[in-house]
Regions:
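Terminal helix/beta-alpha structural elements that buttress the NAD(P)+-binding lobe
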Residues: 1-226
Length: 226
């Protein structure tokens, strides 16, 4: 049975973005549920990743959210700026541009332990909390960040979903999350370039670039298998 309001034209976006933007929704919901952990700014590491962009949509739409700061590579800085979602954008080579006088919460999609350690050193006691989410910098991952255990947590979206299902019920959770995901996916059509690849052979041609992070952030790949 087709779901109510099903839009077939969104099939590719559904495959690409639904699993990511549900995490974005849960991150925003967790942050606001915890009163932003007392932060005055939300630092989003790997700001060009699609899960980060989903979170940025949620933060931009929330009048009560603290300022958002997108951290990204120098090569992606202008592209991230063009999205118009983050209040400020800082590249990894200019961490001193982060306002260290503000209480801060980190949402880390990168898993880059050195980067986290450098940000922690810059912010000092004004780093109040760190949510570890992803591994976009998987080759630089590690545990030596200097951030105390009591200030960091591994964010697992399914656990947050289970909490909200108990509190809200399935219907209310689906209503809130689905509307956010659909609206954000629609907006993403303005920048996302979907590319269809024919089978495993074409996937193999680009697989190394995917692993090495060489794809530009607007690209989104759909592999068609016959």
């Amino acid at each position: 049975e087709t779901e109510a309001g099903y839009d077939r034209s969104m099939d590719n976006s559904r495959m690409l973005l639904w699993p990511l933007y549900i995490t974005s929704f849960c991150l925003w919901d967790s942050l606001q549920h915890n009163d932003w952990h007392g932060a005055q700014q939300v630092l989003v590491i790997s700001a060009s990743s699609k899960t980060s962009i989903g979170l940025a949509y949620a933060l931009a739409a929330d009048a009560d959210a603290p300022a958002s700061v997108g951290l990204t590579s120098k090569k992606n800085q202008q592209w991230v700026k063009s999205l118009g979602l983050y209040d400020n954008i800082v590249n990894y080579d200019a961490l001193e541009d982060i306002d260290a006088s503000l209480h801060s919460v980190i949402v880390d999609m990168s898993g880059n332990s050195k980067l986290l350690a450098d940000i922690h050193a810059h912010l000092g006691d004004n780093l109040l909390h760190c949510l570890n989410v992803g591994l976009t910098h998987w080759s630089a991952s590690g545990s030596d960040t200097g951030i105390p255990d009591q200030k960091r947590e591994f964010f697992f979206a399914p656990s947050h979903i289970q909490m909200r299902l108990k509190e809200w019920g399935a219907e209310e959770f689906d209503k809130k999350s689905s509307q956010f995901i659909y609206d954000s996916a629609k907006k993403s059509a303005d920048w996302m370039a979907i590319e269809k690849l024919d089978g495993v052979a074409e996937l193999a041609e680009i697989y190394t670039d995917v692993c090495e992070g060489k794809l530009t952030p607007e690209r989104a790949l759909v592999i068609e298998l016959s």
